[in-house]
Amino acid sequence: MAQIRIHEINTRIENEVEVSKFLQEEGVLYEKWNISKLPTHLKENYSLTDENKAEILAVFSKEIADVSSRRGYKAHDVISLSNSTPNLDELLINFQKEHHHTDDEVRFIVSGHGIFAIEGKDGTFFDVELEPGDLISVPENARHYFTLQDDRQVVAIRIFVTTEGWVPIY
């Protein structure tokens, strides 16, 4: 279950109902997908082949199709980041720069953890700490950045309206 940390007042929201309500009020789509259906050989696997990535997409194909039909998403892929990723530190530096996109930024966490820091409607940033099974859609034009948690590893399904609209604007 995702958790929220509000930056300026360092308050945490950990209750599932309160997390969902907070994100809904901020215009952030949040869903919990059934991660238990992921085959064992893909759990906590950060060295994925193209076949592994295709299998992950197949496992969650119904959920991807459902959210895509509701929200107008047209493309998806799988990304894996870990300490074995070449230039991980350089990638994280870029990810941690505040930016926005002209399309939603959608991520479903398959393994590992990630944090989206999002500027709220009142101008205060809040972290959404994500774990396996969490899907988030950062709204278009919302200022945000992404980083990894202390384990420095994540596998995520990325879902796009268009890949062109997903280019970061700093």
UniProtKB/Swiss-Prot annotation:
Database matches in InterPro entries: ARD, ARD_bac, RmlC-like_jellyroll, RmlC_Cupin_sf
Catalytic activity: 1,2-dihydroxy-5-(methylsulfanyl)pent-1-en-3-one + O2 = 3-(methylsulfanyl)propanoate + CO + formate + 2 H(+); 1,2-dihydroxy-5-(methylsulfanyl)pent-1-en-3-one + O2 = 4-methylsulfanyl-2-oxobutanoate + formate + 2 H(+)
GO BP terms, alphabetized: L-methionine salvage from methylthioadenosine; L-methionine salvage from S-adenosylmethionine
The UniProt record lists the keyword Amino-acid biosynthesis: yes
Cofactor note: Binds 1 Fe(2+) cation per monomer.
This enzyme's EC code(s): 1.13.11.54, 1.13.11.53
Keyword field contains Metal-binding: yes
Pfam family, any one: ARD
List of residues binding Fe(2+): H99, H101, E105, H144
Names of the cofactor(s): Fe(2+); Ni(2+)
Site (May play a role in metal incorporation in vivo): E98
Pathway: Amino-acid biosynthesis; L-methionine biosynthesis via salvage pathway; L-methionine from S-methyl-5-thio-alpha-D-ribose 1-phosphate: step 5/6
PANTHER family xref list: ACIREDUCTONE DIOXYGENASE
Record-stated family: Belongs to the acireductone dioxygenase (ARD) family.
HAMAP family, per database record: Salvage_MtnD
UniProt name for this protein: Acireductone dioxygenase
Biological source species: Bacillus cereus (strain ATCC 10987 / NRS 248)
